[in-house]
């Protein structure tokens, strides 16, 4: 059969090994519409796409035609058509390790809880998505012009490889119980961390 060893059905996240609520799928090959049929037949609600595992895609517009997903995690060197992800408005977990994924409107994801993304460009819709509880933002290169302080429901926050200089925004994040600051060499003071009572 054409799809032998080209995908795998999983019941846990392949990266953090957390148990999934529903069935997941890892695709090890180039996108083919037969994958969509399999997803519909099996009731797939979690999708993992990683080019280092064999995933290939030149255009992500196929996301518009998929069943509604709870989880979408993409690691790729291509991002053409990635705005089609906005049709997946039921996403709870979204991880985009891709180039040029900055134009996505996060406001469409009313149930979104967990996000991994890059922050080289400002995206107001990301910082207005108050449902987010877990945010990992890499390459946040917009200095202190972000609006992380608006994400008042954050429980877990990781900022990596950033040029931020101030942590004053932490004062607004009353529910934060996990904080990681990685390779952010321009931060001038860490005193604001003392305001976080739940760490």
Report residues per predicted region.
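Concave beta-strand-loop units of leucine-rich repeat
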Residues: 2-37, 43-64, 68-165, 172-188, ...
């Amino acid at each position: 059969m054409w799809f032998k060893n080209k995908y795998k059905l999983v019941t846990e996240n392949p990266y953090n090994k957390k148990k999934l609520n529903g069935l997941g799928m890892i695709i090890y090959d180039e996108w083919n519409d037969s994958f969509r049929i399999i997803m519909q037949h099996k009731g797939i609600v979690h999708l993992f796409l990683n080019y280092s595992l064999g995933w290939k895609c030149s255009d992500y517009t196929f996301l518009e035609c998929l069943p509604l997903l709870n989880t979408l995690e993409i690691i790729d060197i291509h991002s053409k058509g990635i705005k089609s992800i906005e049709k997946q408005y039921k996403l709870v977990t979204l991880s985009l390790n891709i180039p040029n994924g900055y134009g996505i409107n996060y406001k469409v994801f009313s149930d979104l809880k967990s996000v991994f993304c890059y922050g080289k460009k400002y995206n107001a819709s990301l910082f207005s998505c108050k449902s987010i509880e877990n945010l990992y933002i890499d390459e946040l290169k917009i200095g202190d012009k972000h609006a992380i302080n608006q994400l008042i429901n954050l429980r877990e926050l990781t900022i990596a490889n950033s040029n931020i200089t101030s942590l004053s925004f932490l004062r607004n994040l009353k529910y934060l119980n996990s904080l990681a600051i990685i390779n952010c060499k321009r931060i001038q003071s860490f005193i604001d961390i003392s305001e976080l009572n739940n760490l």
